[in-house]
């Protein structure tokens, strides 16, 4: 999960220089510029990936998608799903932790081959990257201390509250763009896990995170069992996809494999293992 090759680091620096020092929002012009350098050459992406014999997959840690299990090994829905797809395609998965706010820079610098970690499909992202068909549904929800679960039901209730979301995420877009939060005080964090820690410690009042994360992290006996999702208030219905460099032919390869795993029932089997089966949409070859 470390960047090991010097020429890749040089590429990352070059890409960062091209896009400038602000990549805080996928809707920024910097994000658009980040996609440009590799669009013309990405057609041969699959040859590049298969030639290495491995697919370098950019992730962040959050349960139940990618996390370290009790045995000390990486596990989770996305981990198992990506492993199954790579097996079908004849390459090895190589999971690499990234800073979510710099995901497109990492992608275009070829320090990773794809972003596979609960990536919300948006028009802006589709303009900058080649994204597979959707494989999971999601929404943004509020998480608070359990004793405050009934406190934040209206925009008036949220006035003056301290809100945290992951920088560059759909949660951040909700925090900044929804009228519900316009009189709250927003602060970004560099991961969804840190958002929960902010609420747990009392530094923030409300975390805006992926609904699927609550399934894995707020269960009884977990480190966050003292937190609770606010019922009846959710935002930004969305779907997840896997992002490759703009113009990449690897995107279609993976989409075709997703369809196969869905038709075989393997995708649903993996989702059920992590209590995510209700989040799997109907998938077919014409879904893109």
Give short role names for the model-derived ranges.
Residues 18-32:
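Bacterial lipoprotein signal-peptidase II cleavage site
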Residues 39-43, 170-187, 225-230, 258-288:
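Ligand-binding clefts/hinges and TM-proximal coupling segments of bilobed small-molecule sensing domains
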Residues 39-118:
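Extracytoplasmic small-molecule ligand-binding "clamshell" domains
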Residues 87-88, 96-97, 101-114, 128-130, ...:
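Short helices/loops that flank or line small-molecule/ion binding pockets
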Residues 102, 119-127, 174-177, 200-201, ...:
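A ligand-binding cleft/hinge motif common to bilobed small-molecule-binding domains
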Residues 130-137, 187, 224-236, 246, ...:
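Short beta-strand->loop
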Residues 141-151, 237-257:
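A bilobed periplasmic-binding-protein/Venus flytrap-type ligand-binding module shared by bacterial periplasmic
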Residues 145-163:
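Flexible hinge/capping segments at coil-to-helix
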